[in-house]
């Protein structure tokens, strides 16, 4: 049900905020713009700057309102008037980050706005002291037991207010944050859900709730308000849960209803494509976003990750210099510079910049993960483990941190730990072949060969990014003396390489041709064996074996040895490789395609 214009400010500024009536759909974009402008002001008054910026950016993407439709500021209550002087002074102190001073002058204030700023100042004071302690004991890697000492007191006071039903939407949001910081996750989720019902326009509450949801099943059981804000929340959580197809559909719907100029939505779409490793699409969107919003810093660390993967040194260098000119002390800027140095193999400098990012914001997920990668490059496994663990503390859905831990314990030759972490990464990214190949290698080391085979085949079935799954599966069949299955895997590997037009010159291609040459030779299929042996001659490591096999085939033919008719060939070479243009047949799936470990 759409809300009338007059209802919105009254609902928000009521003494004890009731459920806020806002639009349930996007049928009235003018009304939505009014609501966004209103909440941008209310969050700014309370020092919730990120929520204010998000609302303002979204409002800016909608058509401007005529003067007659612009809303006046919300009416001032009697309590607001009594606390006005204290609030004005305290807000000035708050804005320059003198949180204790702000809290001191707000003590005893009764208005909702002043009370929130009082409690929020105390919370941020505790966070600042904790972060200072963290930096002093450095590195961010020795964060250890440093806690925000204000949390327990804040919880007690906010709990009393909550039980008395005296918290408005902002108060509920802060109570939820305190509960989350105390690791009271279930209670925090309940409070954040309540906050979204009381004040659906506050993006910060939705975002905090998003950070606590671990899977789609958990999402289904949440009782969320039926408002247009829910669509933004669902698009965001789908992206976080790696449900990229659903996320992209949601964002496309938001563009279609009128938010096509939103830089937030465009950036989220780019992040979604980054998450599914559609690098070209993601790069294209980020480049377009940079043209529209050249001074934007948000998500530029993700953009730099894409440039890093593509080894685009000059573009990454330009991005790093550009962001330095805009704001060298932003966490995203530090991460971009870190990526630049990492691409140049200057890993100590890269780690230093990731540490700088963490001094600015110890809860910045990307910096922890990237620093873990750098410590891995420097062979400092203990520091890498700590960095990845901190990343998981910040966000348990970060598959890169779980995967990094798996790699670290693999280096330490601790396969059971390795298996646990790779499993967690696979749960978060079930269709990522890298996780499946890593799992397969782990099972192989633990001599659980059946499970290893399942993983390798599944990795191939979901789309093998690194084109190694079939080779590893073939070698496993070799180890088990399952020659026919090994040959099937190698021929499919060769077919895949040549069908997609890749020019691959590495050890595994030569390994495949060598095995196939020997396999066909044993089967007395001279034409196929000869073709594969000739291919072996193109590689340094198999050239001599290829020549020797060709000599043997020639000798046997000269002796009148005829090809066998008794041993059936399970498949044939691609027509482009076969001397006699034998047609190809699709490889049997080994009955493993539907099985996951």
Curated annotation (Swiss-Prot):
Mutation effect (residue 374 to A): Inhibits APC/FZR1 E3 ubiquitin-protein ligase complex activity
Phosphotyrosine: residues carrying this PTM: 273
Gene Ontology CC annotation, any one: cytosol
Effect on the protein upon substituting residue 339 to A: Inhibits APC/FZR1 E3 ubiquitin-protein ligase complex activity
Processing after translation: Phosphorylated. Phosphorylation on Thr-562 occurs specifically during mitosis.
Superkingdom assignment: Eukaryota
Pathway(s) the chain acts in: Protein modification; protein ubiquitination
Residue numbers of Phosphothreonine PTMs: 562, 565, 582, 596
Alphabetical UniProt keywords: Acetylation, Cell cycle, Cell division, Isopeptide bond, Mitosis, Phosphoprotein, Repeat, TPR repeat, Ubl conjugation, Ubl conjugation pathway
The keyword Transferase belongs to this UniProt entry's keyword annotation: no
Residues recorded with modification Phosphoserine: 578, 588, 593
TPR repeats: 27-63, 73-112, 114-144, 169-200, 229-259, 263-293, 297-327, 331-361, 366-395, 400-432, 433-466, 468-500, 504-540
PROSITE patterns: TPR, TPR_REGION
PANTHER family from the UniProt entry: CELL DIVISION CYCLE 16,23,27, CELL DIVISION CYCLE PROTEIN 23 HOMOLOG
Role, per record: Component of the anaphase promoting complex/cyclosome (APC/C), a cell cycle-regulated E3 ubiquitin ligase that controls progression through mitosis and the G1 phase of the cell cycle. The APC/C complex acts by mediating ubiquitination and subsequent degradation of target proteins: it mainly mediates the formation of 'Lys-11'-linked polyubiquitin chains and, to a lower extent, the formation of 'Lys-48'- and 'Lys-63'-linked polyubiquitin chains. The APC/C complex catalyzes assembly of branched 'Lys-11'-/'Lys-48'-linked branched ubiquitin chains on target proteins.
Protein family per UniProt: Belongs to the APC8/CDC23 family.
Quaternary structure, from the entry: The mammalian APC/C is composed at least of 14 distinct subunits ANAPC1, ANAPC2, CDC27/APC3, ANAPC4, ANAPC5, CDC16/APC6, ANAPC7, CDC23/APC8, ANAPC10, ANAPC11, CDC26/APC12, ANAPC13, ANAPC15 and ANAPC16 that assemble into a complex of at least 19 chains with a combined molecular mass of around 1.2 MDa; APC/C interacts with FZR1 and FBXO5. Interacts with FBXO43; the interaction is direct.
Name listed for the protein in its UniProt record: Cell division cycle protein 23 homolog
Phylogenetic classification of the source organism: Eukaryota, Metazoa, Chordata, Craniata, Vertebrata
């Amino acid at each position: 049900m759409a809300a009338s214009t007059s209802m919105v400010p009254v609902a928000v500024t009521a003494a004890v905020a009731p459920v806020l009536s806002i639009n349930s759909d996007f049928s009235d974009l003018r009304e939505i713009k009014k609501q966004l402008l209103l909440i941008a002001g209310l969050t700014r008054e309370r020092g919730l700057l990120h929520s204010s910026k998000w609302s303002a950016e979204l409002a800016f993407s909608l058509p401007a309102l005529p003067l007659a439709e612009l809303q006046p500021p919300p009416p001032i209550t009697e309590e607001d008037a009594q606390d006005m002087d204290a609030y004005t002074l305290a807000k000035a102190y708050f804005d320059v980050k003198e949180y204790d001073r702000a809290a001191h002058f707000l003590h005893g204030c009764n208005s909702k706005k002043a009370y929130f700023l009082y409690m929020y100042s105390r919370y941020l004071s505790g966070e600042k002291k904790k972060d200072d302690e963290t930096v002093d004991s450095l590195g961010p890697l020795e964060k250890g037991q440093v806690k925000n000492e204000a949390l327990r007191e804040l919880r007690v006071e906010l709990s009393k207010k909550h039980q008395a039903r005296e918290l408005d939407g902002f108060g509920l949001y802060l109570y939820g944050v305190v509960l989350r910081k105390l690791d009271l996750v279930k209670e925090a989720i309940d409070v954040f859900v309540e906050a979204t019902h009381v004040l659906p326009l506050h993006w910060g509450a939705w975002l905090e709730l998003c950070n606590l949801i671990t899977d789609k099943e958990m999402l289904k059981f949440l009782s969320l308000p039926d408002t247009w804000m829910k669509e933004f929340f669902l698009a965001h959580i789908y992206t976080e849960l790696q449900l990229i197809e659903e996320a992209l559909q949601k964002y496309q719907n938001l563009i279609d209803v009128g938010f096509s100029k939103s830089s937030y939505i465009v950036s989220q779409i780019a992040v979604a494509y980054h998450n599914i490793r559609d690098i070209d699409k993601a790069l294209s969107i980020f480049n377009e976003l940079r043209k529209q919003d050249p001074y934007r810093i948000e998500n530029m660390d993700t953009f730099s990750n894409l440039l890093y993967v593509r080894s685009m040194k000059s573009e990454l260098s330009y991005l790093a210099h550009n962001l330095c000119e805009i704001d060298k002390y932003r966490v995203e800027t530090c991460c971009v510079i870190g990526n630049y140095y990492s691409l140049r193999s200057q890993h100590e400098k890269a780690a230093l910049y990731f540490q700088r990012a963490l001094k600015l914001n110890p809860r910045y997920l990307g910096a922890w993960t990237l620093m873990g990668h750098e410590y891995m490059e420097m062979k400092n496994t203990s520091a890498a483990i700590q960095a990845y663990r901190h990343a998981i503390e910040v966000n348990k859905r970060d598959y890169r941190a779980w995967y990094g831990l798996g790699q670290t314990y693999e280096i330490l030759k601790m396969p059971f730990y390795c298996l646990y972490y790779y499993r967690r990464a696979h749960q978060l990214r079930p269709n990522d072949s890298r996780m499946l190949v890593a799992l397969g290698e782990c099972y192989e080391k633990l001599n659980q060969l059946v499970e290893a085979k399942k993983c390798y085949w599944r990795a191939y079935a979901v789309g093998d990014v690194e084109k190694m799954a079939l080779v590893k599966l073939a070698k496993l069949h070799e180890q088990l003396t399952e020659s026919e299955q090994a040959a099937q895997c190698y021929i499919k590997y060769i077919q895949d390489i040549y069908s997609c037009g890749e020019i691959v010159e590495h050890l595994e291609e030569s390994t495949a041709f060598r095995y196939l040459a020997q396999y066909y030779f044993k089967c007395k299929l001279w034409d196929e064996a000869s073709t594969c042996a000739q291919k072996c001659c193109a590689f340094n490591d198999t050239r001599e074996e290829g020549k020797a096999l060709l000599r043997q085939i020639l000798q046997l033919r000269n002796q009148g040895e005829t090809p066998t008719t008794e041993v059936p060939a399970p498949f044939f070479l691609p027509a482009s490789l076969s001397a006699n243009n034998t047609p190809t047949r699709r490889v049997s799936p080994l009955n493993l395609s539907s099985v996951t470990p």
